[in-house]
């Protein structure tokens, strides 16, 4: 953010809508377009033809981002300046208070074979009932001397783990190998101050495997994103906005909460999200709507399911446009190509629509089409100031 941006902030009776399709980006291969390019998206195509398009680099060229830094960039926070671990995000999403000295981690319920190798990093995406039972077993079976261990279920395979005790540091490497066919990693201390925490995590791993030994799928925990309590400057302070978030998954609700958004809901699905946003439209001037479906399908390697998830978002766009936002941006936080079944470094398509945005030659919303758009190829963190300008919220700079 430019150092003098705050001096340019200009009050305006305008509203901004940021729609994030998680994992939207992909790429074409073997005579087939990306998932977005193969989707039937008449509403998004009309918006693209009437607005401006481009490609966003979530963190930097060639860098594969996690969801946390990718979203921070979209909110106008430099991901290299504001570094958040997944544990802190999950804790904020579940409204679990982290005290000074606590260490939080995001954990996946996962499946190990008889040789101790990971066969499924997400334990087959268990139902909430199945995952809740696994968390109950963990609470009953894990007891570490001098350490208070908290387990909280987030959604499906996602679990929050919080460690509280003397001498703990979050400066640890992950135990999640981010791959199958290999054993979980051993948490290593990045600094001498984290030696005690590494010992605690090793004991946590041992006891959690024992507690889950009889579970057919969710029989271990993979931990990543160790972090402690975090505070970020609010969007109200940085950008003069009164922002709100409509998200289903706790982690994204937590990230929104950390940057000072009013977190609405909960809402169970996309339809409920749109209704909730509509009902609160006059209460805020910036809305973040998060749609998880494309990312989940991409991570499962399911091209068709990702297409369906994109088309579901397209179908609700008329309801959102009926609210008459002054600026709408539709984009993704990162790419999750189904060919890779994982996050990737690819740039993410973005479209901006509104009366002050202007029109470029792009007529369809897709990766290759967006290459020729007026927004160009730029860091995702640039997006916030462009939205502020397009909504009449920045005064002229200089004489």
Model-predicted segments: where are they?
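Feature captures the catalytic ectodomains and active-site-proximal regions of enzymes
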Residues: 1-399
